[in-house]
């Protein structure tokens, strides 16, 4: 009986080996996704990252011309770093055009890789900060300083232009003296009310003298390139600081409330 079972078992083993050679052992190990529990399927796409590990036990040195002998303990590893959790590196680019909140042409900027690869580089707004590109833009910068190329607005200048377009200036003037509005007074109010430093020579007022309260305008030229028209309201000055002007206001109020004025 035992002698008859031996040929049958050997034939089954040979048949199984032939089936594995034809179908491949990978089919046995392939996950049956269609039979898995709903919501716990296998992911067919792997996450492209690098995990750095090292052996827990050091492999002893082998003789010259021989391979080191590995034991089970040499297949035990410990985690050193998972690059998936590594901080995202930034990308250094050189802008070819002005970009809001980033910079102007020729600026060397450091942005997120997603911003650089999805926005700046595909649209031609920037190039890689290679040594050749750095040298090219340095030469262009020197030519602009020498006046051989047209000047461009700086990043601070563009921010100033954008801010002034949304502003309205209020200039307070007293009513106890004769006055005429001039660029020096307007420049002081720009700094006092809006926090913007404007040189008097960069301001342009209407040709007709401004001697009364009302609504006017003034043109501000930023770095000699861009001009912005800012609405301007000339109103009564209501915050006296000098004792003389406070005394004069008190006299005016007393005259209004006195019985003789009525």
From Swiss-Prot:
Keywords: Mitochondrion, Ribonucleoprotein, Ribosomal protein, Transit peptide
Family annotation (SUPFAM superfamilies): L9 N-domain-like (SSF55658)
Superkingdom to which the source organism belongs: Eukaryota
Biological processes, Gene Ontology terms: translation
Location in the cell: Mitochondrion
Main location: mitochondrion
Targeting presequence: 1-49
InterPro entries per the UniProt record, alphabetical: MRP-L9_N (IPR056864), Ribosomal_bL9 (IPR000244), Ribosomal_bL9/RNase_H1_N (IPR009027), Ribosomal_bL9_N (IPR020070), Ribosomal_bL9_N_sf (IPR036935), Ribosomal_bL9m_C (IPR054302)
One example GO MF annotation: structural constituent of ribosome
Pfam families reported for this sequence: bL9m_N (PF25131), Ribosomal_bL9m_C (PF22078), Ribosomal_L9_N (PF01281)
GO cellular component terms, A-Z: mitochondrial large ribosomal subunit; mitochondrion
Family per similarity comment: Belongs to the bacterial ribosomal protein bL9 family.
Subunit: Component of the mitochondrial ribosome large subunit (39S) which comprises a 16S rRNA and about 50 distinct proteins.
Name of this protein: Large ribosomal subunit protein bL9m
Source species of the chain: Rattus norvegicus (Rat)
